[in-house]
């Protein structure tokens, strides 16, 4: 260390955040002046040669997360010839996982950065969906990927949050008797996919009876039966007007309903799971 400073080059064929974070975490354990330089998108042998030459000039350690085996070997061999310390931080774990599972890594670059993007997309979708639950913030309802309408107790919110966890921005709105659907939603007919949730009349009757009892109200069966039938008729009228995809949620769980919706509308799933 000619300048009394430890130089570390964090080299990656992707963004390089992983290599840099490992370098930072490591040098913090030493009381040293240090300089960490990140080299991103290193995909060619010519780039590797230039970086190693710089490492020679600066007496630097290279730590790298190059996924492609050929380029990784080239870096390792070139560094050894030029007497530069180079540490492949992913290789030991690759070997351990391969030994344990019998599977070979797929050597796809950029997966960590892709996962970061997916996390950001999911957080944005969840934030949007929470802010647009139960008819809130209609001024930005046009930014939704999907609008879910439904009677109370038809799992609008759980369904919306399930879809948000897939990166889908959902606005949901309750269907209530004697309440007009806001013009902000009506204007989006045909522009944004809409789903209308319904439920078996007997199940809805039981839910309403429970609600009446919780408020210590008399649950007159005849009156309640008429009210529930009217509720459902009103919901179906609204769904027809808005050209909603109508889904009965009586028996299906949230995941099944979510799958039906995403496949029907080919919604932009921003969260994927990569198999190693």
From Swiss-Prot:
Any GO molecular function: phosphotransferase activity, phosphate group as acceptor
EC number: 2.7.11.32, 2.7.4.27
Keyword Kinase appears in the UniProt entry: yes
Entry function: Bifunctional serine/threonine kinase and phosphorylase involved in the regulation of the pyruvate, phosphate dikinase (PPDK) by catalyzing its phosphorylation/dephosphorylation.
InterPro entries: Kinase-pyrophosphorylase, PPDK_reg
Chain residues that bind ADP: 150-157
Enzyme class: transferase
Keywords on record: Kinase, Nucleotide-binding, Serine/threonine-protein kinase, Transferase
NCBIfam families, per database record: PRK05339.1 (NF003742)
Protein name, per record: Putative pyruvate, phosphate dikinase regulatory protein 1
């Amino acid at each position: 260390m000619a300048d009394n400073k430890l130089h570390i080059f964090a080299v990656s064929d992707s963004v390089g955040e992983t290599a840099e974070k490992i370098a930072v975490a490591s040098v913090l354990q030493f009381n040293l002046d240090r300089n960490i330089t990140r080299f991103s998108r290193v995909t060619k042998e010519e780039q590797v040669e230039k970086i190693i030459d710089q490492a020679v000039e600066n007496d630097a350690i290279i730590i790298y997360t190059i996924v492609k085996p050929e380029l990784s070997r080239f870096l390792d061999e070139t560094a050894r010839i030029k007497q530069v310390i180079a540490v492949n931080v992913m290789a030991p774990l690759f070997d351990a996982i391969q030994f344990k599972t019998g599977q070979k890594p797929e050597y796809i670059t950029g997966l960590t950065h892709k996962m970061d993007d997916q996390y950001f997309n999911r957080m944005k979708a969840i934030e949007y969906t929470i802010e647009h639950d139960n008819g809130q913030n209609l001024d930005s309802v046009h930014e939704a990927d999907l609008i879910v309408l439904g009677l109370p107790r038809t799992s609008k919110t759980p369904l919306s949050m399930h879809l948000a966890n897939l990166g889908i921005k959902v606005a949901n709105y309750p269907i209530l008797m004697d309440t007009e659907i806001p013009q902000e939603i009506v204007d989006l007919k045909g522009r944004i996919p809409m789903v209308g949730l319904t439920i078996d009349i007997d199940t809805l009757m039981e839910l309403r009876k429970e609600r009446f009892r919780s408020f210590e109200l008399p649950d007159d069966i005849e009156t309640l039966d008429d009210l529930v039938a009217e509720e459902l008729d009103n919901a179906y009228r609204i769904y027809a007007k808005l050209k909603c995809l109508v889904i009965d949620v009586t028996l299906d769980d949230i995941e099944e309903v979510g799958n039906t919706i995403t496949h029907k509308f080919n919604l932009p799933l921003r969260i994927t799971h990569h198999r190693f």
